């Protein structure tokens, strides 16, 4: 599966129109793009007690997308649905070079290992993106470690509804904007609720993974192996869909 995380920013005052237009976009994608397996659109979760690193603007819109393959993503990315949406609604979004060129971050990823349960269709899931960085030269070791780790998450955490781990698209013509750090590791994950997320971070599966393999990742605390440096997004879904093909792993 090919995964894309993308971010737009709404110009203040245009929220209602933008959310309605984005909902219509998701419906059109669902109706006309069978190889788009999931297409989820969010605002940041800015509820009290939710920490996001770095803190986002409340005007941010975050897309979490999954495709049959890279070709399906490119078909969407350059296709009529998105092209028409930007032509009509581009002025609602922050832009640097005019209303038909909204400022966007595009993070294109190749799924390494993971699962998505059917419960992920619940729009109230606690959706999280976390981006770690491998230390140079450790890609093979990280790949091997992730297989058993993700299996253990699935087997032991029924409240974890999505847990996919992806590496950056390393092709020379990667459509990522800006180009991604090639040692990035991106977790797209979701839980039944915030409590299930907190439990995941404290339970043995995650803690044992850090103890055994944390040294393979860049650390936020010098000398530590238990504090991987990461940036995060915590999201509230307001539009989108998942097809049955999305339920992998």
What does each model-found stretch correspond to?
Residues 14-41, 81-85, 89-90, 138-165, ...:
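Short amphipathic alpha-helical segments
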Residues 40-57, 84-125, 161-183, 207-249:
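Glycine-rich beta-strand-turn "strand-cap" elements at beta-sheet edges
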Residues 7, 11, 20-28, 32, ...:
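N-terminal/domain-start segments enriched in small and hydrophobic, helix-friendly residues
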Residues 33-34, 118-122, 135-137:
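Short, low-complexity cationic-aromatic patches
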Residues 2-9, 40-78, 124-133, 165-203:
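Short, well-ordered beta-strand segments in beta-rich or mixed alpha/beta enzyme
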